[in-house]
Amino acid sequence: MQLSLAIKRLCPDFVFCGRQSVDGDTGQVGPSLAVRLEFSLVTNVMSLESAENGLFYTDRSENGGNISAPAVITLEKSRRLRLPSIRSKIKPVETLSANDINADISLCGLKGSPTRVLKTFENDSDRRSCTFISPDKLMWAIEEGLKKGRQKIKPAESANKLKNVWCVGSSPIEFAKTVGENITVIDPDTSEKTAEKIRTGHPDAVLWGSDIKSKALAPQVAALLNTGLCADCTALETDGETLYMYRPACSGNIIAKIRCETKPPMATVRTAEEEQNKIIIGIGYGAREHIAAIKAFAEKINAGIAATRKMTDGDYLPYELQVGLTGKTVNPDVYIAVGISGAVHHIAGIRQSGTAI
């Protein structure tokens, strides 16, 4: 909210945002700003060109179009930081106070945040037993993994549940069942129409999926309702009155337990579509020079391909292959990671897999 007040003071034609902030990784700033500024919004933009009446954009789905000012644009691809030029170092930095932007002090800082982190703890939810094998045992390990299949991870249910939980779209239903007695599914609509449905329906909580459309729509609706939104939740619980949300934090090394201070609490939850491929090979930056060989092996064993964010940001592989906290979630019987460090942000997208090699 305070950021929008500062931007209004500057009266820009376009506001450019990254995919997500460096502190929260939630991807809410751009969509929320668009609502508070009453600007148009385009998300997941890969390229921009000047056009007669504004800008022409292409997004990660290879769709494109024109957008005119004023607008908020979130950029999908990260850019390498450049050393500041000598000229920029001598430029004055303008500091705006709360008074300068006419901000309500009671809504600044932690006091104004609609969500609260109640506690954090070490993330050990994805620990598995590990066996070291020699390279000649690879095909054996794949065959064993296929025989074993995967055990579907079912979220733990709370003993006491909220009376009415809404899902925007059907993908969050399994999560909703763990915390809600009565589940209502509504179809995604415009941000204004969706917000109005929620405002008049008075649900105890609203859940969203982790698809691109939901991640753009949910922050807009949260801003319209002046309520909190917790992103990329991996678990939910309730005591029958309050919804508690769990999500990875600090690069995924810890899990944060979060509560909404406003009503209704909203959350996007990590959901996975049923995988067509029983085997998926994930390609990381460490294997960037061997993509052709890996693709040939994948074709030989009838496997799909996935990628880490660094591989897609570096233009080695297309964005639709990205798996992880800021990508999609996959759940094959066998996931083969090649050149991947195993950062928790990537693991978040493969935790429903059967055997990981």
Question: What do these predicted regions represent?
Answer:
Residues 1-357:
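N-terminal glycine-rich FAD/FM-binding segment characteristic of electron-transfer flavoproteins
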